[in-house]
Amino acid sequence: MIFKFFCLDLQSCKHHLKPYIVQKGFKGVKVKDAPKTATSIIVRSASNARISQSKMPMLELMRRIFRKEEVALKAVKFLTLVEERQKSGKPLRVEEWEQIMEELGMVRSSFYSMRNKLLGAGMITIRNGEYHLSGAFSKDLVDMARWWWVVVLGYDPESL
């Protein structure tokens, strides 16, 4: 299954992006018509494919978002940079894009494509011109999991 994350109201919602499931046969927005902020994530059901079981969980998660291994590795590096700068009290600024691109060894279009996927998934946000890690990604996944567990499967929410 592939999840597409994007904001349903792009006018009022710059970077807080709401999830929208797009799958074969879904009668909502078609994948090709999704806004440019859409992010696909591959979901695997096998227990041996769980991210938490991986030796490198962050890289495994990025592999599910980015098709190329090279971009997945650079996304890990970018997220690590955002996290380190956030923790140091000197958040990474949007205007530092040239230095970031150089450090990651990326051209401008590739950098912004990677960054926009991370924004679209709700993994990062931009506030006051600064990059910050975001919990929107986690909240969206928890919400989807809870909905599936309770509404579709009919289980008690407390048993999740």
UniProtKB/Swiss-Prot annotation:
| Naturally occurring in which organism (per UniProt) | Archaeoglobus fulgidus (strain ATCC 49558 / DSM 4304 / JCM 9628 / NBRC 100126 / VC-16)
Put simply, this protein is called Uncharacterized protein AF_0843
Which superkingdom heads the taxonomic lineage of this protein's source?
Archaea
